Amino acid sequence: MARREGEVTETLLKKSTENRGEDRDGLGMKEKVWRESKKLWVVAGPAIFTRFSTSGLSLISQAFIGHLGSTELAAYSITLTVLLRFSNGILLGMASALETLCGQAYGAKQYHMLGIYLQRSWIVLTGCTICLMPIYIFAGPILLALGQEERLVRVARIIALWVIGINISFVPSFTCQMFLQAQSKNKIIAYVAAVSLGVHVFLSWLLVVHFDFGIAGAMTSSLVAHWLPNIAQVLFVTCGGCTETWRGFSWLAFKDLWPVFKLSVSSGGMICLELWYNSILILLTGNLKNAEVALNALAICININALEMMVAFGFMAAASVRVSNEIGSGNSNGAKFATMVVVSTSLSIGIIFFFIFLFLRERVSYIFTTSEAVATQVADLSPLLAFSILLNSIQPVLSGVAVGAGWQKYVTVVNLACYYLVGIPSGLFLGYVVGLQVKGVWLGMIFGIFVQTCVLTVMTMRTDWDQQVSSSLKRLNRWVEPESPSRNQTLQNE
């Protein structure tokens, strides 16, 4: 064992030394930025499109269910907002550990380890999904305990049982996305996402409108639309699309599960604290004066912000992939340069959106409402919306850098402190004590994001990238397995 680990270390050090020389290639700054930008957009472009397509699945279901009745629409919205968003955040966060592991292993040219990491992540996330299943099975009592009306709960608990299949679909969906992104092969994800979107529209019309199957028809279409891209991705991975990185099912997937689980939990905590933050914002404004108008205006602003966040999350994925690849390859300067390029690109786009929404003000609200009172409130909130969009062009990207470098544990603490010890108390104070109402609540929570962004910026600027390469090397040295496993370890030959 010691001899094998020594050989692995020697191999990785050799590759690390070779890759450090890549910076001395004689290219000027303009050429380097252009080359890095192309690598960046190979990941970011498909990731952004996939995010929009995935969000489109829920919007399409919501549109067709909305025609069945207001009770059905409210029940569907509650199920997705309260139950699915909760479990989605946990699974997406835990799957992001795969970005760190696969990205660094791919950069180190330990290609065979990507398939093993993928299988380990399948095992960890499947166990997590089973643990989350009771929230859907007992959705009725849970929603009643949260104060929802009984007539809504009767419909919601039926929808919740259908959503179990969607929740399970997140396991292959998130893990295969991370696996393919690490290799910059995520175009296939965008293609199948586009196909599933079209299939969902057709099936929803056929089952809900033409055959009048109601909720059962809408949820059947949603299940098919969620599983179709998963089947395509798994087939692509296992049937020849990733010959270097997929060597077949292996017993090694059951080895070193505890370290993978710990990294997954750290990643889950980091992402969940971010995804649940806006949900808490909605809850905090529910008891304010003129709450209906405030909530409608805030919902419009959050929907606009969420659309822009799709772009930011695309750059977050690109940052994670580029940083992890460069760290894994031993190119510390490359990791630093990739960080600078992705942050600059995302910030430039954020500045454009900042001025667009700052000057559009209430005009954009008429896309969502005809109420003058709501439009006026949106105009009042537009500076906060514009500033949120500007911060969102930086903060998720820095989180992506953290994922690529493997800092999830530290960023979880930062998120907890900035969001829940700074942002929420500030929002409560400004909204309820000072009396700024919804503007005060949002302003306080933006302050939490601002503090978090400042902390992550300082962390990134003070990072010793050579030390990050060394830490990555140690992790690879601990977890890497022989490139040609013996027959008793492999379930499927190459």
UniProtKB/Swiss-Prot annotation:
Region of interest: Disordered = 1-25
> Which Gene Ontology molecular function entries are recorded, alphabetically?
antiporter activity; xenobiotic transmembrane transporter activity
Name the major location: membrane
Q: How does it sit in the membrane?
A: Multi-pass membrane protein
Keywords from the named record: Membrane, Transmembrane, Transmembrane helix, Transport
Subcellular location(s): the record lists: Membrane
The family database entries (InterPro entries) matched by this protein are listed as: MATE_euk, MATE_fam
Task: Enumerate the transmembrane spans.
Answer: 40-60, 74-94, 123-143, 158-178, 188-208, 223-243, 268-288, 297-317, 340-360, 384-404, 416-436, 441-461
* GO BP term, example: xenobiotic detoxification by transmembrane export across the plasma membrane
GO terms under cellular component: membrane
Is Transferase there in the keyword field?
no
Q: List, alphabetically, the NCBIfam families matched.
A: matE
Q: Which family does it belong to?
A: Belongs to the multi antimicrobial extrusion (MATE) (TC 2.A.66.1) family.
| Matches recorded under PANTHER family | MULTIDRUG RESISTANCE PROTEIN
Can you say what this protein is called?
Protein DETOXIFICATION 23
Native organism is Arabidopsis thaliana (Mouse-ear cress)
| Species lineage | Eukaryota, Viridiplantae, Streptophyta, Embryophyta, Tracheophyta
